[in-house]
Regions:
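Periplasmic solute-binding protein
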Residues: 82, 127-147, 156, 163-203, ...
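Short, solvent-exposed loop/beta-turn-alpha elements that line the ligand-binding surface or hinge
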Residues: 58-64, 143-161, 230-233, 248-268, ...
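Extracytoplasmic "Venus flytrap"/periplasmic binding protein-like
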Residues: 82-161, 196-205, 302-303, 319-320, ...
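Long, aromatic- and glycine/proline-rich binding clefts that accommodate carbohydrate-like moieties
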Residues: 37, 48-55, 66, 326-331, ...
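Short, low-complexity disordered leader/linker segments with a strong preference
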Residues: 1-66, 457-474
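Glycine-centered hinge/linker elements that transmit conformational signals in sensory
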Residues: 212-218, 255-286, 327, 331
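Short, well-ordered beta-strand elements
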Residues: 63-74, 93-98, 121-122, 226
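Hinge/lid segment of periplasmic solute-binding proteins
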Residues: 36, 41-61, 127-185, 211, ...
Length: 474
């Protein structure tokens, strides 16, 4: 239960997508350069004599300060809420939060920034908002805090985050603005019992195998082999459209920052999606995460590709009929290999907040994302971005989905899954509209891709990317 002193606007139980990544889009994803400043040690803080720094001591000047956070109604935020009383007890800082639907969270924060209403101190930054929030000056570069020995925990260890998470979720133009907090990868969730009944000992390793071998055997009696959440909106543009072009060698933009959806490899992924629809529920174009997760949990579909954060719904007997049958694997590979979806959020500090609130907010962000609290955060239902937590044998046994998650982040993570520049929201809307029309058959894949390429180029040209007014950053 939320305390009565918390401000809450309860959203839907399972909310929309989160999404992804960085850098100008090459055909083979390349991780951005490490954002950890060279002039600081691996901790991200200046050297401090042993025993000199403590959270309680660092927080003394801010005792009694209240900070307000933007949270979603998802497992990672409920996990943080469980841990917050410990932070408050140590520091005397009062942490409040407002829970809002994902769909409203960007707009509410932008209105707070532009109106200077100062409602939020601890800012929630989706991977695709980092460019907009940073370039607009709405969030504070975190070196202000991690280079201050009074505020920086000597054990901060920025290099302890999975590099792809810190670089994609929290970094823009080589400057860190947020620390990874709610961390996702796409995972193939499957009903092991349904697969075994159909004669399969393991899930498909490739998309082609899913289509040609698994699809026909698992689609019968009003049950389906696969479901791909595709509702118009961010779910269509990211979870469905972008998820399908990358494994086939496609991309939104090419190495020259030109729209690339009409390339043969991008078209191959979109054509494959059309073909796969015969093994999906007929109304899947209307499905969001909620419908997709429930369909697997209730035994109506055999496989889905979804965010790792939804695992709790499959293991809870109150929400799932397949608790003894749930299986996990890396997302299937295409002709160029596996390119699982990458998504998540970082926590940042509002530039509009007072210096006292900024410092208090930093102390909270540093603590809740720390290596010290990572295991507690995971046990409470969160997904930490800290590498060390996933080496714990007890946690690995308790959470078997760790394996595909860590493999995806470490080996297959695609840092350019979706651009993070400020122009993504209007581009996403266009993809959502045309992508839906493609799936419904009201426009051909080829015509839809041609239309999108022209629209995307117009947006990027108007923004100044081709004139040199803006750097070609994603």
């Amino acid at each position: 239960m939320l305390s009565t002193r918390r401000q809450c606007q309860i959203g839907v139980l399972i909310v929309s997508s989160v999404l992804l990544a960085s850098c100008a889009a090459p055909s083979t994803p390349q991780a951005p350069a490490s954002p950890v400043p060279a002039q600081t040690p691996a901790t991200g803080a200046r050297p401090v004599e042993p025993g000199q720094w403590s959270l309680a001591k660092a927080a003394e000047p801010y005792k009694g300060v209240t900070i307000n956070c933007v949270f979603l109604d998802r497992p990672g935020y409920r996990a943080a809420i469980q841990l917050i009383p410990e932070f408050e007890s140590i520091t005397g800082i009062d942490v409040t939060w407002e829970i809002m639907p994902y769909e409203n969270s960007r707009e509410k924060q932008v209105l707070d920034f532009t109106g200077n209403t100062k409602n939020y101190d601890c800012i929630l930054i989706d991977v695709v908002w980092i460019g907009e929030f940073a370039a607009s000056g709405w969030v504070v570069p975190l070196r202000k805090f991690y280079e201050d020995p009074a505020l920086a925990d000597p054990n901060l260890n920025l290099k302890g985050f999975f590099p792809i998470l810190l670089e994609s979720f929290g970094t823009w133009n080589n400057e860190i603005y947020g620390l990874p907090f709610d961390n996702y990868s796409g995972v193939l969730f499957y009903n092991r019992c349904m697969l075994e009944e159909a004669g399969f000992k393991e899930p498909p390793k490739t998309w082609q195998e899913l289509l040609e071998v698994y699809g026909p055997k698992l689609t019968k009696d009003r049950k389906y082999a696969f479901a791909l959440q595709s509702r118009r909106g961010e779910t269509q543009s990211a979870d469905s459209f972008m998820r399908m072009i990358w494994p086939f060698g496609g991309s939104l933009l090419d190495e020259n920052f030109e729209p690339n959806l009409s390339s043969e490899k991008s078209l191959a992924g979109l054509r494959f999606r059309q073909e796969l629809m015969k093994y999906m529920p007929p109304d899947v174009v209307e499905w969001d995460h909620d419908e997709t997760v429930q369909a697997l949990a209730q035994g109506r579909v055999a496989m889905i590709t979804e965010w790792s954060a939804f695992n709790a719904y499959f293991t809870d007997p109150n929400t799932s009929k397949i608790t003894d049958c749930i299986g996990y694997a890396v997302e299937p590979a295409g002709p160029v290999g596996s390119r699982p979806a990458l998504g998540g959020f970082s926590l940042g500090v509002s530039a509009n907040s007072s210096p006292e609130k900024q410092a208090a907010t930093w102390l909270f962000i540093q603590w809740i994302t720390s290596e010290e609290k990572a295991k507690d955060y995971i046990r409470a239902g969160g997904v930490s971005g800290r590498m060390s937590a996933y080496e714990d044998p007890e946690l690995k046994a308790q959470f078997p989905y760790f394996e595909p998650l860590v493999v995806s982040w470490s080996k297959y993570g695609n840092p350019v899954f979706r651009p993070r520049f400020p122009e993504w929201p209007p581009i996403s809307e266009l993809i959502a509209q045309t992508g839906t029309e493609m799936m419904l058959g009201s426009i051909s894949v080829e015509e839809g891709a041609k239309r999108l390429d022209a629209q995307i180029r117009e947006i990027l040209e108007k923004a100044g990317y081709y004139s040199g007014a803006k750097p070609k950053l994603q």
